[in-house]
Design a protein with these regions (language model features):
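Feature captures the catalytic cores and cofactor-binding loops of soluble hydro-lyases/lyases
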Residues: 1-188
Length: 188
């Protein structure tokens, strides 16, 4: 039995509002690697299926949070493909989307603030060095506050695929995953 249970909350400069990692079944509780960034699950899945990633990579799937998805899709397909290729312990995956209990490997989800709101996950670039430590409960990118602030000033919100309709309305009203993605007036 683990003193923390099967999941651990993480915080740091990459996830000031937090993120969740499932540690049940993990052999190592720390991971350091270089970011490999994707702006949706489909592009990440295509890269994984084509094996266009390597051991030590931290696969970043962003713009899948409550606002960005919209709806916070589950990343099980990508994590399943990584694990099926025998890379579950050799790469990590970080997303502002979510995972189910079936997820295997070093996967951090529910990262907030999400990319669609300009959270630090939106500011990552390929090659940035990321440290995840489930023992300490930390998740950080090796960038200074000044470097993150500079990137934030240059960041532009990604245009949504939805300009009207139910998903657009949802994206306008939903709150952060850290509060349960509420859609009521007290969302923030």
């Amino acid at each position: 039995l683990s003193p923390t249970g099967g999941v651990v909350g993480l915080k740091g400069n990459l996830a000031p509002e937090g993120g969740i990692v499932k540690i049940a079944g993990l052999k190592k509780l720390q991971f350091t690697g270089r970011a490999r960034c994707f702006d949706n699950e489909e592009s990440a899945m295509k890269a994984v299926q084509s094996r266009k990633y390597k051991d030590g990579d931290v696969i970043i799937i962003r713009y899948e949070g409550p606002v960005g998805g919209p709806g916070m899709r589950e990343m099980l397909s990508t994590t399943g493909a990584i694990y099926g290729q025998g890379k579950g312990e050799k790469v990590a995956l970080i997303t502002d989307g979510r995972f189910s209990g079936a997820t295997r490997g070093f996967c951090v989800g529910h990262v907030g603030p999400e990319a669609a709101l300009g959270g630090p996950i939106a500011l990552l670039r390929n090659g940035d060095l990321i440290d995840i430590d489930a023992k300490k409960g930390t998740i950080n990118v090796r960038l200074t506050r000044a470097q993150l602030a500079s990137r934030k000033r240059k960041w532009k919100a990604k245009k949504s695929d939805f300009g009207s309709g139910t998903l657009w309305k949802y994206a306008q009203t939903v709150g952060p995953a850290s509060l349960g993605a509420p859609t009521h007036p007290g969302k923030k």
